[in-house]
Every structure is written in structure tokens, then in C-alpha cells.
């Protein structure tokens, strides 16, 4: 017999039956379990557990105690051509391709495994950012109708910024691999003409009827609050670091938002995320927010990255290239598409 305190609590706990393999570990003393189901080959369970544990430890260390859960469950269903996830307060339901698990002879994480680690990182971060910190219109959720907010950039976009960043912070991927992921994100957004038609605030608000009802013209008409939201979060983080001379970061803002949630259990009203960010840091960020959220101007990526010694170049590359990190400039044949590539302006890159 299973019992919950409310209907809301019931639907926040996914259920799966079948043949399931359990892998257990602890992160900061909190029990975690990965439940694998579906069809998948043998894989390096030791490495997989160690990598997920490092990611969880790193995310837990960023936020003040207590964590929003006393135990955590990853439900991972594996098959062919699967990818996705849905967050819950103390668990997540994930779908992934069976070939994304690490093989015994894998050295540096390959593309498929990196994407899998990023999926774990993304949905785990949602325990703080969405399931705890959330828009006021989601507290509580109204399940009888759509809930509209301009703030999805702050909840999905910021989470998308941190998901890959935590792979670098936890050292499950190299700084160079992280910069390649970042270059690919920039390339995807720049190749979307919809960024010149729709603002981030509009993208967030119209998610119900545009982002989740896409057609063949969508790339020309809309921009992703996940992808562009992640780049806006990157710029915001770097601007805060530079303007405060390192006293504050986006981490500082997220930590205080979580404290606010723990103290009040109230959601964030529209536009108040930006107000609270400026209160926490003591910085005037209105010009940035106006540009990033309410205009279709391109984000100041090159200027922001230059502040931490990273140079952003746009060069002709085949579409399948997608963007990359380069320690030295490389000559490439002209192509019809622009791709983003990074090069270091010093002899090393350090991400913290």
C-alpha cells in the first residue's frame, strides 16, 4: 500500500514496473538510486556511478542546506533513439538511447555519453530551480488550464546553462569539451532566424501554443527559451562577475533565490526575478535585462566571454560541424553556414 498526502504529491512521484536494475550511491550523505529499465548493453557501471555522483555532489555543494529532498531517484529507461526527461521534487524520469552508456574502454566522454550526463545534470538541477524556486503562477499549479509566465528563460534557460557547466565543474568533461558544447549552443541559436522575430519573454509566454506546437516555419518565427535562455544566463553570470569584481556570481543569485523559497515557499512574481537579482548583487542590470529579455537584439556574447579570456569567432563551417573549441586558429574551407568556434587567448582555460 502506498499513500500520499495530496494529489499533487501523488503525481509528483513517477512509477515504473518491470525488470529494473538498481545502482545506488550517496551524495553528501543523501541516498541516491538509479533505476535502469529497457534494453541496453553491458557498460562500465563503476564509471557511470562515479560520474553521476560527482555531478550530484557538485550541484548539492552549490546550494545552501537543506536540500529539497532526503533521497533521490533517477528513473532511466533505455532504448533506441530516445532522449528526454521530466523533473520531480525528489526524482526524475529519463529517456535515453541505449548506446549512450559508457563502454569499458571509453576514454574521454564521447558525444552520446556527454549528452546523457547533461540530461542527468539538467533534471537534477530542477529540484532547486523549478520544483523549489518557481514562478508565482506555478505556486500552486493550476492543472485545469495553461499557466502562462514570461519567466521560463530563468527556469529552463538557467538550468540549461548550468547543466553543461556542472559537467565541467565536476570534472566529468574537460574545459575544452565544455567550450565545444558552448560553441555548439551559440551556433544553434545563431542559425535560428526566429531569434530576430521573438524575444525571450515572448518565447517563454507563448510556450503553450508556439514552442510545443512547432511547424516547418518555427525556426524562422520563434527562439528557444532553453537555448537562448542558457546563453542569456551565461552573459548574466559573466556580467555579474565583472561588475562586482568577483564578489557575486549567478551562483550567488540562485543561492539567495533558494533561501527565499525555503523561508517563504512563495513563487516569484512576473519581472521580480530580475528585480531580486539586482537586489542580491547590488548592481544595475536593467540595460542587460531589457536587451536580453525584451528585445530581439543579439546577446553580447563576444564581449562577455572576452572578460574571462575566451575569444568568440564566427567562421564558415559545414552545417554538420556545429561549432567547436580550438586552442589555435584553424583554416577552414568556406561553407554556406556560420559556425562558432572558441580559441583561448591565454595558455589555458579555467572554468569555476
Question: Can you say where each PLM-predicted feature lies in the sequence?
Answer:
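Alpha-helix capping and helix-loop boundary segments enriched in small/acidic/polar residues
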Residues: 43-47, 81-85, 104-115, 146-154, ...
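Active-site-proximal alpha-helical
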Residues: 59, 152-298
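Short, solvent-exposed turn/loop segments enriched in Gly/Ser/Thr/Pro and often Arg
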Residues: 70-82, 131-133, 182
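Active-site-adjacent bridging/hinge elements
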Residues: 26-33, 84-86, 91-95, 128-139, ...
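Non-catalytic architectural context of zinc metalloproteases
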Residues: 1-69, 82, 99, 103
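Catalytic zinc-binding patch centered on the HExxH motif and its immediate surroundings
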Residues: 79-104, 340
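Zinc-dependent metallopeptidase catalytic helix centered on the HExxH motif
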Residues: 93-194
